[in-house]
Amino acid sequence: MLTPNLTEACRILDLDYHKVDLSEEGLVAICEALSDMGPSRIVITGLQQGDLIFNYIFEKNKTSELLSTRKIGGDRSGTGDVFSSIVTGALIQGQDFKTAVKRAVTFLDKAIAYTAQMEPPWNYGICFEEYLEEI
């Protein structure tokens, strides 16, 4: 499994971030190139458009999906770590990949909304402890 944001995916593949095609065909091409390096399950995280954030879920030889959620506040340190940890834990528990990703997105949506209310400095990450029992 690999869960890069777009910047990380571009660096891995030596692509110019500013020239990347973000259409579904472009995202499939990025994920297939990453998959050729080993991982069969990939999520390109944090694709922003307006008030939404998208995660592109790719699983080799399966139908891909673009999952959206609301953008809450500014960027936060550590969200990718929390995301990949929840997905990994859900996979270990036997959930399928798309369900695991949706579980992580739902958890982060709640935790980020709570963090926005608490207003800690951005580099403190997210206040996820409030929702740990839900995962």
Feature locations, PLM:
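Conserved phosphate/ATP/ADP-binding segment of small-molecule kinases
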Residues: 1-64
